[in-house]
């Protein structure tokens, strides 16, 4: 009798586990949203328990580590944001009714990646508690930068490069070529993102090359003018540069020499100004002799006047 009951007991246990086991799902594998906009990452959970003691957690999965997006406890409903998601992430208003979705605002290219939704309930720890969704932020290509690698001299090999620093999905690149008469010319297309290789170039290689960078969000362009020259022109260019450098050095030398001479003249003038000006207070000998005679005459006059005064004094007393 007991042996016959074992299958029934196992069935009841299996049913109980199935009923209590939590199930977390993300209905979409990939979501697309434009840069600067908002996106809702959907996530739902199913459980037979009515208790909501636990939390909802979202993380971004990186190659080397996990980056926290947000933790939302059922008990106090207080957000615990990751550093890069403060004031940008909010949980669904129906979080307690099986909706664990989040909304991310102000999307940037850095938000590209895979996100994991996790629901943990203390009363239902069995089952599938996690699910993932990939977010692709759509960004139009930035204006590409065009460049030439190598010297545009007849017989050389050169490469034309084109690269947008931003763009999601990754921009696709294409090239067009026009001669100096603005007529489109054939051009072998490289693999997208690879440079255009031009080998053994000649004057026929000269012209305008236009690169187009595009994805589903937009298109941008850049262009290069290729002017192929002969080696003799290259030598003339170097000679011209050398002459210019020598001339500049000569001019600089002249300026330095003039400044030094001017400095010496200024020092000489300062020294002369510092010497006492003897002419200002030395009188010529003739003037000194004249002054001496005038002083002698003045002294004689005073002595004579004193003698005269002495003779007249008795008469004045008698009167």
UniProtKB/Swiss-Prot annotation:
Q: Which GO terms describe its cellular component?
A: extracellular exosome; plasma membrane
Chief place of localization: membrane
- Where are glycans found on this sequence? 112, 200, 223
In this protein, which residues make up the domain named Ig-like V-type? 22-134
One Pfam family matching this protein: Ig_3
List each copy of the Ig-like C2-type domain by range.
Answer: 140-227
**Which portions of the chain have biased composition (kind: Basic and acidic residues)?**
267-295, 303-319
Q: What are the TM regions of this chain, as residue ranges?
A: 236-256
Taxonomy, superkingdom: Eukaryota
For molecular function, the Gene Ontology terms on record are:
signaling receptor activity
> What subcellular compartments does it reside in?
Membrane
Q: Which residues lie on this side of the membrane: Cytoplasmic?
A: 257-319
Q: In which tissues is it expressed?
A: Expressed in normal gastrointestinal epithelium and in 95% of colon cancers.
Stretches of the chain found on the membrane's Extracellular side = 22-235
Residue span of region Disordered: 267-319
Membrane topology per record: Single-pass type I membrane protein
Q: Does the keyword Membrane apply?
A: yes
Cystine residue pairs: 43-117, 146-222, 162-211
InterPro entries for this protein: A33, Ig-like_dom, Ig-like_dom_sf, Ig-like_fold, Ig_sub, Ig_sub2, Ig_V-set
Tell me how the protein is altered or processed after translation.
N-glycosylated, contains approximately 8 kDa of N-linked carbohydrate. Palmitoylated.
Q: Which residues form the signal peptide?
A: 1-21
Question: Which key words are in the record?
Answer: Disulfide bond, Glycoprotein, Immunoglobulin domain, Lipoprotein, Membrane, Palmitate, Signal, Transmembrane, Transmembrane helix
This chain's function reads: May play a role in cell-cell recognition and signaling.
Task: Output the PANTHER family linked to this UniProt entry.
Answer: CELL SURFACE A33 ANTIGEN
List the protein's name.
Cell surface A33 antigen
Which organism was this protein described from?
Answer: Homo sapiens (Human)
């Amino acid at each position: 009798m007991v042996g016959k009951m074992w299958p029934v007991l196992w069935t009841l246990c299996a049913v109980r586990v199935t009923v209590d086991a939590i199930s977390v799902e993300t209905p979409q594998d990939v979501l697309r949203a434009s840069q600067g906009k908002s996106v809702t990452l959907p996530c739902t959970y199913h459980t037979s328990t009515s208790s909501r003691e636990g939390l909802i957690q979202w993380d971004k999965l990186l190659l080397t580590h996990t980056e926290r997006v947000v933790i939302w406890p059922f008990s106090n409903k207080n957000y615990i944001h990751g550093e890069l998601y403060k004031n940008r992430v909010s949980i669904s208003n129906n979080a307690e009714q099986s909706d664990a979705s989040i909304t991310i605002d102000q999307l940037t290219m850095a938000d590209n990646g895979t996100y994991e939704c996790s629901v943990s309930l203390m009363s239902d720890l069995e089952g599938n508690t996690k699910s993932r969704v990939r977010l692709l932020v759509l960004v139009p290509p930035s204006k590409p930068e065009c460049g030439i690698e190598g010297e545009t001299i007849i017989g050389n090999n050169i490469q034309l490069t084109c690269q947008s620093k931003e763009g999601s999905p990754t921009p696709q690149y294409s090239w067009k070529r026009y001669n100096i008469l603005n007529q489109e010319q054939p051009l072998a297309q490289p693999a997208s993102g690879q440079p255009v290789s031009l080998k053994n170039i000649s004057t026929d290689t000269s012209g305008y090359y236009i690169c187009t960078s595009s994805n589903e969000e937009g298109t941008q362009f850049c262009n290069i003018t290729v002017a192929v020259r002969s080696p003799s022109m290259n030598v003339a260019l170097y000679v011209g540069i050398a002459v210019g450098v020598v001339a500049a050095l000569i001019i600089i030398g002249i300026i330095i020499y003039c400044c030094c001479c001017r400095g010496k003249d200024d020092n000489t003038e300062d020294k002369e100004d510092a010497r006492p000006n003897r002419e200002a207070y030395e009188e010529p000998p003739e003037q000194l002799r004249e002054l001496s005679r005038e002083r002698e005459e003045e002294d004689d006059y005073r002595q004579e006047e004193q003698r005269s005064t002495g003779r007249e004094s008795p008469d004045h007393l008698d009167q």
